[in-house]
Amino acid sequence: GISQTPLGAVTGEENADGDDQKALDVLADQLIEQALAKTSLFAYLSEEREQPVPLSASGQLICACDPLDGSSNIDTNLTIGTIFSLYPAPDHKTETNLLCPGRDQIAAGFFAYGPQTALLLTYGNGVFAFCFDGAQYRLMDWQVRIPGQTSEFAINAANHRHWSARTTSYIDQLLAGKQGERGRNFNMRWAGSLVADCWRILRRGGIFLYPEDSRRGFESGRLRLVYEANPISFLVEQAGGLATDGERDILDIQPTELHQRVPLIFGSANEVEFYKSD
């Protein structure tokens, strides 16, 4: 089981996106496939797999999943998670037809494995938070709404030299604080785990930026539209925030391939709008 796995060990293999796989990445993917095989889902789309995994030919739903987000944090014992979403299966089931815009999602969420094991979930009618008590998931007393205003931002500042002029200008304004044109101080938070950064923003507001940049392989962003950006954006919008690639709402983008990458900026609505207008 997971508790016996060399958690941070690298397998020597790469996943469908060319990222190094860790032992727990592979195990998480296998466990999820085994669990979904017992359901009536039509197909399993995994960030770890090149192709869809067929399940039940009569199934009416598709599950898209990042089995283990933030796996670079495994050996440092920081928060990691599982991101997922559900789509209706198309009438004529081909691989091309499995590519649906995020607006078609009927449910999405993520599990966070940190100081507490928790679940954030939306069915398109708000966001609900659950905490695992060792036996079952219990609904938390938390009205999940992202504050419209924020004084926190999340970005990997080590990539500053690769950013576009717009991203550089925006972050420089935040760093200027009270002495700058924004007239107030901002704090930077960066967990290196999408689920951890998203949880924090859902809790207390903020803006998350993983923009495109000039590095090879990053020109169109780095996060996966189907497995990461769409489910996170569905949660964010349902909590009153916004999610964009800088030009379009993430949920309006029509995927052209399973492992398509996009820039992702999400969080407090006012701050996301400010970034888009800069």
Regions found by a protein language model. Name each.
Residues 2-4, 13-15, 23-278:
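IMPase-like, lithium-sensitive Mg2+-dependent phosphomonoesterase catalytic core
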